[in-house]
Design a protein with these regions (language model features):
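Active-site region of chymotrypsin-like
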Residues: 3-19, 46-105, 149-154
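Beta-strand/loop subdomains of soluble extracytoplasmic proteins
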Residues: 28-34, 38, 43-57, 66, ...
Length: 212
């Protein structure tokens, strides 16, 4: 890589930005992908292969992501980007979510879920933080275990706003500031409407024996 400060204006004007693909809609198993950057553990390396999975969910704090896995062999410490055959970025390489038996296969976090975060970082926008990891409630859980529709809390960050507010692991978020929450996406969108320091009302349903 070369610092932009070392490039003259003519060279800079000839450069073009990489377009971002919609990784949620355009990626499917079998698609050809290219790993660029440092996939092999040393600078300016490249890898070529196909996507093997596009539906693995990563449950992060306050936001979920999609893990794109490939059959490209690389380094356990790889980094860089994953592009499709049209040259559009579909993901950022991240090996930390790989299973031990797949530690040298290149994986990436889908770019679509990262776009808003990248925009916020570029514009120095502070993101609200509640401190919960959530997942969608499956139809089977609703049918057989009477779990209500909403964002099911699978983990809580220590000393977070959620923990201090009395929210527990196993609770289901069903509304935020009066807006109904039926999924992880609803939760993320509603939280994104808030600003750091805002006081919000969170409606939860808590398990009590065999009901909520």
């Amino acid at each position: 890589t070369i610092p932009l400060t070392q490039l003259n204006d003519t060279t800079k004007s000839a450069l073009s930005y990489a377009a971002l693909a919609n990784s949620q809609l355009s990626c499917k198993p079998g698609d050809i992908v290219i790993a660029l950057g440092d996939p092999l553990g040393y600078g300016s390396s490249i890898g070529y292969g196909i996507l093997t999975s596009t539906t693995t969910e990563i449950n992060g704090i306050d936001h979920n992501y999609t893990l794109l896995t490939t059959d490209i062999y690389g380094s356990a410490n790889a980094n860089g980007i994953l592009i499709n055959k049209n040259g559009k970025v579909v993901g950022l390489i991240n090996q930390s979510f790989n299973k031990p038996e797949h530690k040298t296969l290149i994986s990436a976090v889908g770019i679509t879920e990262l776009t808003k975060l990248i925009e916020n970082l570029c514009n120095d926008v502070k993101r609200p933080h509640m401190g919960v990891s959530v997942t969608n409630v499956s139809s089977l859980a609703m049918r057989y275990y009477n779990v209500p529709m909403g964002a099911y809390i699978i983990d809580i960050e220590m000393d977070s706003a959620a923990m201090k507010g009395g929210i527990h692991k196993g609770d289901v978020i069903t509304a935020m500031n009066g807006a109904v929450v039926t999924s992880v996406l609803d939760y993320e969108l509603d939280l994104g409407e808030c600003a750091p320091g805002d006081e919000i009302t969170v409606t939860i349903m808590r398990p009590n024996d065999d009901t909520y």
